[in-house]
């Protein structure tokens, strides 16, 4: 692999890791969006496997409340597993272009809603069954499109978690989604072979960027974090919508 290609990979994953460290999501989208400017999409996708999985696990384990969050969110994880393995919608998968655009618009609208200081109502006493429903719907969308964020991310934000607990909850959801999606692809025979060695090269800058983003989050106030979180959702949604339409 040429030096300039390695440099591009390092810079892209450093940036993508920093964003993920700060707001808890966005690494695959940012990395794919930038890498495909310099290489084929298949090559870019092969680089994502190790950094995406490892940064999700790191995000999960470094948080302060793994046990309490696991006990609270197990219905969401159970629903996510069932939805991913059994609820994939062929119609969505066949129309993945417009589906990604629609999901992007949902994130944009939710981000604007959050910046306007409006909030989704907390689920309250309905949290257990609502978590299962949201998990199932997220699993269906994940199986059909490979997108983990809708509707899980808006729902987790509605639980009124602290910034560190929210980041850890996102890591829990994304890690589970990655594992179950991989299992679903393996079972259906659609899991493609990737070069783990090449993918591992991208892990170092991704972790370095993530560490920097985590430091920035630690020194942020809750208010500043929420602003960055919603702006990040808008940017992520805008990219998804644009890539779906163009």
Q: Where are each of the predicted segments found?
A:
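Hydrophobic residues within alpha-helical transmembrane segments
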Residues: 11, 15, 50-57, 74, ...
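Selective hydrophobic functional segments
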Residues: 47-96, 178-223
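Signature of the 12-TM Major Facilitator Superfamily
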Residues: 43-50, 101, 168, 172, ...
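Selected transmembrane alpha-helices and immediately adjacent juxtamembrane segments
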Residues: 1-38, 120-170, 177
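Juxtamembrane helix-boundary/capping and inter-helix hinge elements in multi-pass membrane proteins
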Residues: 38-42, 63-69, 157-165, 188-192
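Hydrophobic alpha-helical transmembrane segments in multi-pass integral membrane proteins
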Residues: 44, 87, 91, 141-147, ...
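Transmembrane helix exit motif
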Residues: 56-67, 88, 102-127, 214-215, ...
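Structural signature of hydrophobic alpha-helical transmembrane segments
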Residues: 5-6, 35-53, 97-107, 136-146, ...
């Amino acid at each position: 692999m040429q030096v300039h290609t390695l440099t591009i990979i390092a810079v892209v994953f450093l940036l993508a890791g920093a964003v993920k460290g700060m707001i808890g999501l966005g690494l695959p989208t940012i990395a794919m969006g930038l890498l495909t400017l310099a290489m084929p999409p298949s090559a870019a996708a092969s680089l994502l496997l190790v950094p995406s999985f490892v940064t999700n696990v790191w995000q999960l384990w470094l948080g302060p409340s793994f046990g309490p969050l696991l006990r609270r969110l197990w219905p969401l994880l159970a629903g996510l597993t069932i939805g991913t393995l059994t609820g994939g919608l062929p119609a969505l998968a066949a129309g993945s272009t417009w589906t990604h655009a629609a999901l992007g618009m949902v994130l944009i609208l939710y981000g604007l809603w959050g910046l306007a200081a409006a909030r989704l109502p907390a689920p309250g006493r309905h949290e257990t069954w609502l978590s299962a429903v949201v998990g199932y719907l997220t699993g269906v969308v994940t199986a059909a499109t490979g997108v983990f964020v809708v509707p899980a991310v808006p729902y987790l934000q509605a639980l009124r978690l602290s910034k560190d607990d929210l980041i850890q909850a996102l890591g829990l959801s994304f890690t589970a989604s990655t594992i179950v999606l991989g299992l679903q692809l393996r079972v259906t025979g659609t899991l493609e072979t990737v070069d783990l060695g090449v993918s591992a090269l991208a892990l170092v800058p991704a972790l370095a960027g993530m560490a920097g983003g985590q430091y920035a989050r630690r020194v942020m106030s809750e208010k500043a974090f929420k602003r960055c979180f919603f702006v990040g959702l808008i940017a992520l949604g805008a990219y998804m919508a644009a890539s779906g339409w163009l």
